[in-house]
Amino acid sequence: MMTAEKKKEIIAKFQQHEGDTGSPEVQIALLTERITYLTEHFKTHKKDHHSRRGLLKMVGQRRALLNYLKDMDFNRYRKIISDLGLRR
């Protein structure tokens, strides 16, 4: 699970300005952290289908944010993809 300290660390790394918690980069980074955690969770809990639905919703939300960022500012999109190591 993501602790408050880990969340603050991610926000500080990806924020665009002081106090920024809602920019697409921050939201994508936080979703990626939660997706990574759940992916590891499913390696040991294969039959946890309720959480799998939540994972699929998060992946879809992250995809929508990435598409938005790609349309708005392609350079920021490429930077977040490379920083997080995502395939696109």
Curated annotation (Swiss-Prot):
Keywords, sorted A to Z: Ribonucleoprotein, Ribosomal protein, RNA-binding, rRNA-binding
Gene Ontology biological process terms from the UniProt entry: translation
This protein's record includes keyword Cytoplasm: no
One MF annotation (Gene Ontology) recorded for this entry: structural constituent of ribosome
GO CC annotation, single: cytosolic small ribosomal subunit
Xref: Gene3D superfamilies: 6.10.250.3130, S15/NS1, RNA-binding
UniProt cross-references to SUPFAM superfamilies, sorted A to Z: S15/NS1 RNA-binding domain
Function, in words: One of the primary rRNA binding proteins, it binds directly to 16S rRNA where it helps nucleate assembly of the platform of the 30S subunit by binding and bridging several RNA helices of the 16S rRNA.
Family annotation (PANTHER family): RIBOSOMAL PROTEIN S15, BACTERIAL AND ORGANELLAR, SMALL RIBOSOMAL SUBUNIT PROTEIN US15M
HAMAP family tied to this protein: Ribosomal_uS15_B
Family according to the record: Belongs to the universal ribosomal protein uS15 family.
Subunit structure: Part of the 30S ribosomal subunit. Forms a bridge to the 50S subunit in the 70S ribosome, contacting the 23S rRNA.
Name the UniProt record assigns to this protein: Small ribosomal subunit protein uS15
Organism: Desulfitobacterium hafniense (strain Y51)
Upper lineage: Bacteria, Bacillati, Bacillota, Clostridia, Eubacteriales
